[in-house]
Amino acid sequence: MVAYRFLTLISLGLGSHCASALQYGYNQVSTHKDSAVVAGAFPAINGTHLQSPAFTSPGTVPRGFSDGTSGPTRDETMEGFMRRLARSNSWMTYHKADFKSEEGRKFPYMYLSASKSSIEKPSSHKLRVWLQGGVHGNEPAGDQSMLALLGDLAANQKWAAKLLEKMDILVLPRYNPDGVFYFQRYLATNFDPNRDHIKLARQQTRDIKELFARFSPHIATDMHEFTAGRAFGPKKDIIYAADALFSSAKNLNIDEGIRQLSEKLFAKRMGKDIEAAGLRWDPYIIQGESSSSKLLLREAGTDAKIGRNAMGLSQCVVFLCETRGIGIADQHFERRTLSGLVMVKSILQTAVDNFDEVYNTIERGIRRFTNSRNDIVLTDRSPIMERTFGMLNTTDATLFDYPIDFATTTPAQAVLTRSRPRAYLIPPSWPDIVKRLEVFGVKADKLPHSYVGPVEALNVTSVTFDKEYYEGVVTTTVETKLVERNIRLPAGSYLVKTNQKNAALAFVALEPENIDSFASFGVIPVSTGDQYPIFRVE
């Protein structure tokens, strides 16, 4: 108890975002199920038949699911389900990753293909699709919707065959098995798995990202849930009405054609498909702080530390798909899982129905990005507009459109840009930086000889510490001035060329002004007056 109080005092002193202290394991949120009035606005959808373990084998659901202390599907139940499907369907292959979680749990995944392709040898002229769930362990409709998709494909062979004519699919249903075991958001070490995509603090993050980079998908989805009971308004009597919130990748260093494809084709179709299923949706948002009396909601941001943008920076179409479920235990679970299933099926069907447009747009976007000499974007802003957002009154379950200020990232507006270097030079004393880049799928050439010549260097003019302690570091905001100089670096230095598909991940990591850069997270520590030890080659 003394230790717990000590941690609580630390968290309260470090900032408002540290709402409570964490312990080892079982960091579970409070359960507040919907009242009967609110629950009436989220009825079961007639004709729903979900082909996943929680619904086909209800006897396997742990008791703790009903009170919010457990998810519905244990690891062994999930693995047995996946193995049975693979045995019965030649186009489904069950795999276990060659790495394990922080507590030694396995990562089973399914590879779906109508040909003899594999991750290492993909089919030619087919879309590669990566689907993941269970990133946060207390969001069970995320991985359950992935299992429901597998069951649906097995039950609808013609539909599966139609999809697999045009794509190969990798399904990783449970990204965070330790978090699922403890029914907590975090990894076993209490790092947030969805905030570790650039700093790469945990080996588990690196292992999964290396698998992702090897597969090199054209399309990816990340299945989550959002807090059901978050209340707004002067009386705290209105909540989000949506069953589903979704967002594409927003970072401005993603090819514009790929971002436009996400918004104008996939997002529009997804909204229509959600409504056709009798469900409600809105764009994914978080609450912001506003100086006015009007509620400010911020659309999903551009920060690369989040999986949606980190995956998108490999120049692919990515969607974060969220369903209404955190904090309500097993309530409405069928409707929640259906919401996730509808979204992922919409993405797959849209890709197949528009295969030529989707495949060619993404491939052209990759080539355009790889060969581009356009400036890169280091910081951006979200312009604020007025709009309405679907809300539900908790006193009488009235559905209505609520006026809000909306900080939009469709698109964000660039603030600080810089010329795109042809390469970065990294001294041999920083092999850990190179290793991180290689995890991203960025190639680095080790120079057999010394490098002597002109470079662009960055002199640090300002380092401002943020007010909060975040996952072991106090992050910084760094400002620099670009200068030209001649440099001599020894043999064994690294040259990272930027005419490669995943170079945008190098941009956000290596340019110190970026909010998620290695400098910001102290991976490359700098102080005012220093010269940043990574150099740009023009």
UniProtKB/Swiss-Prot annotation:
Superkingdom, natural source: Eukaryota
Cofactor(s) for this UniProt protein: Zn(2+)
GO biological process, one term: proteolysis
GO cellular component: extracellular region
Positions annotated to bind Zn(2+): H136, E139, H224
Glycosylation sites: N46, N393, N459
Pfam families for the chain: Peptidase_M14
Signal peptide annotation: 1-21
Gene Ontology MF annotations: metallocarboxypeptidase activity; zinc ion binding
Ranges in a coiled coil: none
Residues annotated as catalytic: E322 (proton donor/acceptor)
Intracellular or extracellular location(s): Secreted
Domain Peptidase M14: 71-351
Keywords: Carboxypeptidase, Glycoprotein, Hydrolase, Protease, Secreted, Signal, Virulence
Enzyme Commission code: 3.4.17.-
Main EC class the enzyme belongs to: hydrolase
Region (Disordered): 53-76
Family to which this protein belongs: Belongs to the peptidase M14 family.
Function: Extracellular metalloprotease that contributes to pathogenicity.
Protein name per its UniProtKB record: Carboxypeptidase 2
